Amino acid sequence: MPAGVPMSTYLKMFAASLLAMCAGAEVVHRYYRPDLTIPEIPPKRGELKTELLGLKERKHKPQVSQQEELK
């Protein structure tokens, strides 16, 4: 095996790394909870709003890009 590591140690590290990666992906997926509903009419440009579960109210005004100000 690479760098003289025994096969059993290599497989243990591989399994631990794979388990940690899958657990991390599950935590992120549960935290952000994607909206999997498909709207009938797509939202107009600038209408789609997303928020994190922990942020229910905005503490500041959303920033408007310079391109949207020119319209």
Swiss-Prot record:
The keyword Protein biosynthesis does not apply. InterPro entries: BRAWNIN. It comes from the Eukaryota. Induction: Up-regulated in response to glucose, serum, fatty acid starvation and AMPK activation using 5-aminoimidizole-4-carboxamide-1-beta- D-riboside. GO terms for cellular component: mitochondrial inner membrane; mitochondrion. The keyword Mitochondrion applies. Residues 1-8 are mitochondrial matrix. Keywords: Membrane, Mitochondrion, Mitochondrion inner membrane, Signal-anchor, Transmembrane, Transmembrane helix. The chain crosses the membrane at residues 9-25. GO terms for biological process: mitochondrial cytochrome c oxidase assembly; mitochondrial respiratory chain complex III assembly. Cardiac and skeletal muscle (at protein level). It is a single-pass type II membrane protein. It holds the Pfam family DUF4516. Residues 26-71 are mitochondrial intermembrane. It is found in: Mitochondrion inner membrane. Its main location: mitochondrion. PANTHER family: HYPOTHETICAL PROTEIN LOC691921, UBIQUINOL-CYTOCHROME-C REDUCTASE COMPLEX ASSEMBLY FACTOR 6. Required for the assembly and stability of the mitochondrial ubiquinol-cytochrome c reductase complex (complex III (CIII) or cytochrome b-c1 complex), a multisubunit transmembrane complex that is part of the mitochondrial electron transport chain (ETC) which drives oxidative phosphorylation. Mediates early complex III biogenesis. Participates in regulating the levels of electron transport chain proteins, and therefore energy supply, in response to changes in energy demand. Also required for cytochrome c oxidase complex (complex IV) assembly. Belongs to the UQCC6 family. Interacts with UQCRC1. Interacts with UQCRQ. Interacts with UQCC5. Forms a complex, named COMB/coordinator of mitochondrial CYTB biogenesis, composed of UQCC1, UQCC2, UQCC4, UQCC5 and UQCC6; stabilizes nascent cytochrome b/MT-CYB and promotes its membrane insertion. Forms a complex, named COMA, composed of UQCC1, UQCC2 and UQCC4; activates MT-CYB translation. Forms a complex, named COMC, composed of UQCC1, UQCC2; UQCC3 and UQCC4; mediates MT-CYB hemylation and association with the first nuclear-encoded complex III subunit UQCRQ. Interacts with MT-CYB. This is Ubiquinol-cytochrome c reductase complex assembly factor 6. It comes from Homo sapiens.
